[in-house]
Design a protein with these regions (language model features):
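Outer membrane beta-barrel transmembrane domains
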Residues: 1, 6-12, 22-140
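Outer-membrane beta-barrel "beta-signal"
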Residues: 53, 62-64, 143-156
């Protein structure tokens, strides 16, 4: 098992003219409990953040456009301590185990840019979303991921 502590913070502001801005931050610490192969001393620090900007009334009175820059939750530092066999004595037929640090920090750092427009159209609601992800999954060698979606909702 493990014990995790997460701290979240968010600030936002609405301005005249339908403008809004916001920022969020999440910081976490996880400590693994010693059990089986897990040795005491493993600790992981993680972090995520996002910055948002939006505008209500871009092309009409009730449409909205927003932009988000973010980094999804990522291990910043730390890892697990494993109690593993590291040597073997053939004369006594016994293994010697020592605590080995296993780092869990990825080499990559995923970054995301998202843009969305939504508003009423043809008696329903239309939203158009596009995104770019650099180093998706926090994998340094991963190529960029680009995509989008169009959604139309019509109630009846």
């Amino acid at each position: 098992g493990a014990t995790s502590v997460m701290i979240d913070g968010r600030v936002s502001a609405l301005w005249h003219g339908g403008w809004s801005v916001g920022a969020s931050w999440r910081e976490g610490t996880t400590r693994a409990r010693a059990a089986g192969l897990l040795a005491a001393g493993g600790q992981i620090r993680s972090r995520a953040w996002a910055i948002d900007a939006g505008k209500l009334g871009v092309f009409g009175a009730s449409d909205r456009m927003a932009l988000r820059l973010s980094q999804p939750m990522r291990v910043q530092s730390g890892g697990l301590m494993l109690h593993l066999p590291t040597s073997y004595d053939y004369a006594s037929a016994s293994a010697t185990a020592t605590d080995v640090a296993v780092p869990l920090t990825p080499f990559g750092r995923e970054q995301v840019v998202e843009m969305v427009w939504s508003g009423p159209m043809l008696g329903g609601d239309l939203s158009i979303n596009s995104y770019w992800r650099g180093q998706p999954g926090h994998v340094a060698a991963a190529g960029d991921d680009v995509g989008g979606a169009i959604r139309f909702v019509l109630g009846f």
